[in-house]
C-alpha cells in the first residue's frame, strides 16, 4: 500500500495555518503557551518503514534513530512528533541529536543557519496509518482522522525526517507571547 502525502494542505481548513508554518513549530507553540514542554516517549534504533527510508535516502535495512515525543502547551498535548535520524547522520554537527531528552529537536535544527528544510508534505491520517497508531498508543483519547505534516531537514549530506501530528487541542491555543 502506497503512503501518499499531499504537496498542499488541501481540505485542512482550520489546521492550515499550523500545517503550513515553515518556521520553528517550537517557537510558534511557545508563543501560544505560558509553559511549553517536550515529553519524551520513545527513543530507539529501528529500521524505518519503506516510505520513510526513501525520503531519507537510506536502505530500509539500515537502522535509524527513532524519537517520539509529545509537545505540550500548558500541560495539554497539542502535537505528537516522530523523527528519524539515520545512524550516519549522528556524527559531527548533529551528534547530539540522539541525546536531546526533553529538549526540542526543532530548536536544535533551527539554531543552525546552514540547515535546509525540504518541502512540507501533508496528510489527513486515518486510524489505520502507522503514525496514527504510534500516537494513539500514548494519547488514547485521540479520535477520528488527524492532520499531519512531514519534511526532511538537511545539513550537507545529513538528513532527519520530522513528522508532526496536530491534535485538535492545537486549535484552541490562545496567542500569549508575540
Swiss-Prot record:
It is found in: Cytoplasm. Substrate binds at residues 67, 105, 164. Pathway: Cofactor biosynthesis; ubiquinone biosynthesis. It catalyses: chorismate = 4-hydroxybenzoate + pyruvate. GO terms for cellular component: cytosol. Disulfide bonds: none annotated. The keyword Cytoplasm applies. Its EC number is 4.1.3.40. Keywords: Cytoplasm, Lyase, Pyruvate, Ubiquinone biosynthesis. It is an enzyme of class 4 (lyase). GO terms for molecular function: chorismate lyase activity. Its main location: cytoplasm. It comes from the Bacteria. InterPro entries: Chorismate--pyruvate_lyase, Chorismate_lyase_/UTRA_dom_sf. SUPFAM superfamilies: Chorismate lyase-like. The keyword Cell cycle does not apply. GO terms for biological process: pyruvate biosynthetic process; ubiquinone biosynthetic process. Removes the pyruvyl group from chorismate, with concomitant aromatization of the ring, to provide 4-hydroxybenzoate (4HB) for the ubiquinone pathway. Belongs to the UbiC family. This is Probable chorismate pyruvate-lyase.
Amino acid at each position: 500500500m502506497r503512503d501518499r502525502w499531499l504537496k498542499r494542505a488541501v481540505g485542512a481548513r482550520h489546521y492550515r495555518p499550523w500545517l503550513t508554518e515553515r518556521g520553528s513549530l517550537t517557537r510558534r507553540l511557545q508563543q501560544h503557551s505560558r509553559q511549553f514542554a517536550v515529553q519524551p516517549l520513545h527513543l530507539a534504533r529501528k529500521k524505518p518503514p519503506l516510505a520513510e527510508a526513501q525520503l531519507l535516502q537510506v536502505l530500509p535495512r539500515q537502522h535509524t534513530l527513532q524519537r517520539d515525543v509529545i509537545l505540550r502547551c500548558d500541560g495539554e498535548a497539542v502535537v505528537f512528533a516522530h523523527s528519524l535520524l539515520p545512524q550516519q547522520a549522528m556524527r559531527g554537527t548533529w551528534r547530539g541529536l540522539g541525546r536531546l531528552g526533553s529538549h526540542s529537536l526543532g530548536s536544535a535544527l533551527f539554531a543552525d543557519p546552514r540547515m535546509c528544510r525540504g518541502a512540507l508534505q501533508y496528510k489527513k491520517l486515518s486510524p489505520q496509518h502507522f503514525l496514527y497508531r504510534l500516537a494513539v498508543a500514548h494519547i488514547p483519547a485521540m479520535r477520528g482522522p488527524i492532520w499531519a505534516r512531514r519534511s526532511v531537514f538537511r545539513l550537507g549530506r545529513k538528513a532527519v525526517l520530522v513528522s508532526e501530528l496536530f491534535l485538535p487541542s492545537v486549535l484552541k491555543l490562545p496567542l500569549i507571547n508575540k
